[in-house]
Amino acid sequence: MTYKFPNEIKNTETVKSLNLSLELCSETMYYRDKYPSDITFFVNDIELFTWTSPGDFGGRRGKYTPKSWPLTSTQFGLLKTFKIDSKGVTLDNILVNPNVNINDLNIQNNNVITLTIKIKEDAIHKGGINIFGKNFGDYNQSIILTVTSI
């Protein structure tokens, strides 16, 4: 899946960080709480990291999932936040990739910021991806991307 966000950063600004927050989990038919999936994140075609989702969650209604959505289907995910700055890439405040930093993303020279989320061909756990938006899951938010600059 690829999302394109408008880039409002001027090429005269210095980008300090990019932050992203989203609710997601693995994907299988119906749901399966123990169903790992290796989900890889890219920004502007630069690979950032791979996170292994532990499962495709159901068994109870998500806090914001509509009553019309069947209980036999995926209901909620995990809220994950990552940040790219001069020190590298952090996931939930833990450094996961010190080899890519904010300058590698070339944000100032692009009209859009491209976020790609996928299961790579060589992934060990190929369990698919569920991404939740506003009014679904346990967190009432869409994908949130913010860029800090000076």
Model-derived features: positions:
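Short, surface-exposed, polar/charged, turn-prone segments marking secondary-structure boundaries
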Residues: 46-51, 68-70, 142-146
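Extended, solvent-exposed segments with strong compositional bias
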Residues: 53-108, 124-127
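Short, well-structured beta-strand segments within conserved domains
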Residues: 18-20, 101-103, 108-122
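Mid-protein regulatory/catalytic core that forms ligand/cofactor-binding pockets
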Residues: 1-62
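Generic hydrophobic, helix-prone segments enriched in Leu/Val/Ile
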Residues: 16, 79, 143-145
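Proprotein-processing/basic-patch segments
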Residues: 118-150
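Ser/Thr- (and often Asn-) enriched beta-sheet segments in non-cytosolic proteins
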Residues: 2-4, 83, 112-116, 144-146
